[in-house]
Amino acid sequence: EEIEVLDLPATGGLSFRWRGCWPKLAMFKSRLLDGVDLALYLDLDVVIVGSLDPIIDHARKNAGLHILREWNPSIWGLVPLSWRPDRGGQSSMVAWRPGEQDHLFADVLADPEPAYKRWRNDQRYIQQKARDGHYFPPDFGISFRRHCVWHYPLNLIFRKVKKPKGPAVVVFHGKPKPSDLTRDDQSRWGTKYRYGFGPVDWVKAYWRRGLDAPKKVRAPADLDDQGRARHLSS
């Protein structure tokens, strides 16, 4: 498939605030996505394991901005979702209609310091400042470390990490990173109490497919005055 590459706009002082992922807000710049009726943002460190169609259909049918809900620590998984503390948004997956959320970038670019102090990171800011913000249904995206890896000591018994069948997107936040699960040795990965050893087949296959696939990228400079491709670079 051909991929059209668009340059992200200058982010001013936000470019120095990678802790908190503030430069990510450039995706909301006015007119950046002119002609696009719906945008679905995914972090690079996610693994897509199912069709994105239900996610896109949901965002089309329901107005506003949609964001994942941050997952709760293990013990809270034993109670209904409505009983769990709301930890705010998780911006590994966000959907919105371009033009409706331009203020998210404009406001923080105009006066960033109060936003840094009040919200501390991009996902709290997005979730709380979005116009008509909603959480995605919880089965659209899951956490790799919270939903796919057993807590110690059960992880020593159930060592095989199975590919989930329901959700479309598996999010890697914190440790481990997808690349940690592609090594051929039996090195340990993960957190203190949720960890494993060696490669995870389905993550490795997905990650390698992306690295090994021939790249056909359409850059802005490759388009003529009518928006047609002059050439494709590999």
Q: What is each stretch, according to the model?
A:
Residues D43-V47:
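The conserved acidic donor/metal-binding loop of glycosyltransferases
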Residues L14-F16, L78-R84, L156-F158:
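Short, P/G- and charge-enriched loop/turn segments at secondary-structure junctions
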Residues A39:
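Short aromatic/hydrophobic "clamp" motif used to bind/position activated sugar donors
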Residues E1-G35:
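Active-site-proximal specificity loops/subdomain of glycosyltransferases
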Residues I48-D86:
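Conserved donor-nucleotide/metal-binding helix-loop-beta segment in metal-dependent transferases, i.e.
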Residues W96-S234:
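A glycosyltransferase accessory/donor-loop signature
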Residues L81-R97:
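Conserved core of the sugar-phosphate nucleotidyltransferase
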